Amino acid sequence: MSILNLARTNVLTLEPYQSARRIGGGSQGNIWLNANEYPQPTFYMLRSSNLNRYPDCQPQELLNSYAAYAGVQPNQVLACRGADEGIELLIRTFCEPSKDKILFCPPTYGMYRVSAETFGVAYCAIQALDNWQLDLDTIYAQLDCVKLIYICHPNNPTGNIINPSDIRQLLDITHGRTILVVDEAYIDFYPTASISSWINHYPHLVILRTLSKAFALAGLRCGFILANPDIIKLLLKVIAPYPISRPVVDIAKQALSTKGIHQTKRRVANIDINRNWLIQQLAECSCVSVVFPSVTNYLLVRFHPNYHVFQSLWKKGTILRDQNQQIGLANCLRITIGTSLECQNLLTALQALTLVSHKE
């Protein structure tokens, strides 16, 4: 008997999430602008001892630190292994397989769909409007059996914030019916748009956060769920007994210190400078059709198809993120904002590509 006969049926047909690292793992690239990572390493002193002992399930000092940073109470915070685990925890906690649904609005982050499929939960994909805002009328019409709505804010890969009044309308219409999950993985690049303070007014609001982006700790795998205490208590029934290792807690606490937060704000300021410069320069490239506005550490760019930008740059060692298969994103690439030198090298490569195309 084949071992495949023992696997769950939905796993056999599951299309796994193609992370930037998985896609680009075999490349010899030297400029990695595909994973929305911070382009330079951060340095922390590992102070953990007693590694022979299991860590606390939810280290109180870490919860206190992140609560202070996010402007919520410690009992409204749950620490997890990146925001991706938060996505899965919510589905495992609130959705009955083969009965309930989740809803999301493409083009958006692909893990919402993959996580639902992994656990045998159906999904409803409501395409965003042309300006990548929520199609509220269609969402309202599709709420039957929907337990969770995932809204990415700012949205990945488009880089725009979602209209706060639309989020509030969605919260009002789903009260007592559906949990609204707002994924704020990139909110540290535009903190004034955060709705974390709304948790006190909406018991069905959940917010996802991470240290992977602005805090430059993608390799640490540390994220947070912000929600009312009743939701946190339910999630604690489902989460692994020791989700956050002592070294992760150690480094995360340093990142959330006064000094660490100051360093993060400096990184965000540097990214803003590089992003604004790159927007101006890309707009002058003849291979570029549209540079979409962004408040994050990445840009969505539509290229003229005849330049074959993704493949051409890949061969030269510059790795971008292809978004061509996403709804409404034909000929689009997502470009992580790198160092000033990486941005300059990218621009030089695009200009060279343009020259070659003109000669042909």
From Swiss-Prot:
| Cofactor(s) for this UniProt protein | pyridoxal 5'-phosphate
- Tell me which Gene Ontology terms the entry assigns under biological process: L-histidine biosynthetic process
Q: What class of enzyme is it?
A: transferase
Q: Which cysteines are joined by disulfide bonds?
A: none
Gene3D superfamilies noted in UniProt = Aspartate Aminotransferase, domain 1, Type I PLP-dependent aspartate aminotransferase-like (Major domain)
Q: InterPro entries this protein is in?
A: Aminotrans_II_pyridoxalP_BS, Aminotransferase_I/II_large, HisP_aminotrans, PyrdxlP-dep_Trfase, PyrdxlP-dep_Trfase_major, PyrdxlP-dep_Trfase_small
Name the keywords, alphabetized: Amino-acid biosynthesis, Aminotransferase, Histidine biosynthesis, Pyridoxal phosphate, Transferase
Q: What is its EC number?
A: 2.6.1.9
- Asked if the record carries the keyword Transferase, the reply is yes
- Catalytic reaction equation(s): L-histidinol phosphate + 2-oxoglutarate = 3-(imidazol-4-yl)-2-oxopropyl phosphate + L-glutamate
Family in the record: Belongs to the class-II pyridoxal-phosphate-dependent aminotransferase family. Histidinol-phosphate aminotransferase subfamily.
The protein here is known as: Histidinol-phosphate aminotransferase
